[in-house]
Amino acid sequence: MRFVDEVTFVVRAGDGGDGCVHFRREKYVPRGGPDGGDGGRGGSVYLEGDEGLNTLVDYRHDRFFSAESGEAGGGRQCTGRSGVDRILPVPVGTLVMDEGTGEVIGDVTRDGERLLVAAGGRGGLGNLHFKSSTNRAPRQSTEGTAGESRELRLELQLLADVGLLGMPNVGKSTLIRTISAARPKVADYPFTTLYPQLGVVRYEAQRSFVVADIPGIIEGAAEGAGLGVRFLKHLSRTGLLLHLVDGVAEEERGGDPVADAQTLLAELEAFSPELAQKPRWLVVNRLDALPEEMRAERVAEIARGLGWDGPVYGISGLTGEGVDRLCGDIMNDLEARRREEDGETA
């Protein structure tokens, strides 16, 4: 299925039904009073979170969605039937904006959560409401009001605890395959990952976290080069970023892992200073390609070259070396953050 993370379309709620002008007419009651009923309300349009969806592709071609209008009122004080609401399923993590004004309408962050995006019109009043001591037979009623209509912009921002950052071919996809049930494509050429991938890491019973892998970032990404920049927004909700570098880039392709890491950080800051301020851990990958006696020094060498003062890990996503320790520390860090947040909101 094609991954689509931005769409625009128009929604229109149903109009309210008109009020009714009607008089009571029964045997032996030739001149009964007014009994016109109210119109039914128009159906509203809602977006509903669905954890089974991970793309907005269903809204790529359909550009208009409407709810049902309410029916007119009837005699004998019968209220018209209300219009049926329109429910549009969207992936959890969908940000909803008014395309015309730029207003943020809301954020769908939970499965089953509903967000009202267009309210149905109110039903009109029947002539029963206009009876008075001076007007016993009113012939007036009101029309139903129009339902809301607006153009929406939806942006999907995947919900993940941890984001993987790196240049193309540093082994992000291999790592996410090793630690989770996700199965992204793995191959020895750039941009194997074309779309964001999510993986659930089950560290122990009842302990898990979600990892997001996006296409690799290259120099000039903030100006649109490569594939990764348009997906960086999917890391905006993460609590922790893992900055992966290739520990054998120099030996295998004459690369410089320190320069690569500096390039990625510069692109990250150019795209979003706020994203660049998120906690980041340095992860030196592909150590299995080095002799065992060289691995620790290679990790330390890269960390020194970057002036890195945060956590540093040496791993092999292919063989699993160092991965258990990394996942355990991630789990503990995330749980500590959650406890801290719970304490602040208590």
Swiss-Prot record:
Keyword presence, GTP-binding: yes
NCBIfam families named in the record: Obg_CgtA, PRK12297.1, PRK12299.1
Protein name per UniProt: GTPase Obg
Residue ranges annotated for the OBG-type G domain, each copy included: 160-335
Family statement drawn from the similarity comment of this UniProt entry: Belongs to the TRAFAC class OBG-HflX-like GTPase superfamily. OBG GTPase family.
GO biological process: ribosome biogenesis
Cofactor: Mg(2+)
Binding positions (Mg(2+)): S173, T193
Subcellular location(s) of the protein: Cytoplasm
One GO term describing the cellular component: cytoplasm
SUPFAM superfamilies tied to this protein: Obg GTP-binding protein N-terminal domain, P-loop containing nucleoside triphosphate hydrolases
Quaternary assembly: Monomer.
Keyword Transmembrane helix: no
Keywords attached to this entry: Cytoplasm, GTP-binding, Hydrolase, Magnesium, Metal-binding, Nucleotide-binding
Taxonomy, superkingdom: Bacteria
Functional description taken from the UniProt entry: An essential GTPase which binds GTP, GDP and possibly (p)ppGpp with moderate affinity, with high nucleotide exchange rates and a fairly low GTP hydrolysis rate. Plays a role in control of the cell cycle, stress response, ribosome biogenesis and in those bacteria that undergo differentiation, in morphogenesis control.
PANTHER family: DEVELOPMENTALLY REGULATED GTP-BINDING PROTEIN-RELATED (PTHR11702), MITOCHONDRIAL RIBOSOME-ASSOCIATED GTPASE 2 (PTHR11702:SF31)
InterPro entries: G_OBG, GTP-bd, GTP-bd_Obg/CgtA, GTP1-OBG_CS, GTP1_OBG_dom, GTP1_OBG_dom_sf, OBG_GTPase, P-loop_NTPase
Span of domain Obg: 1-159
Binding site for GTP: 166-173, 191-195, 213-216, 285-288, 316-318
EC number: 3.6.5.-
Bias (Polar residues): 130-144
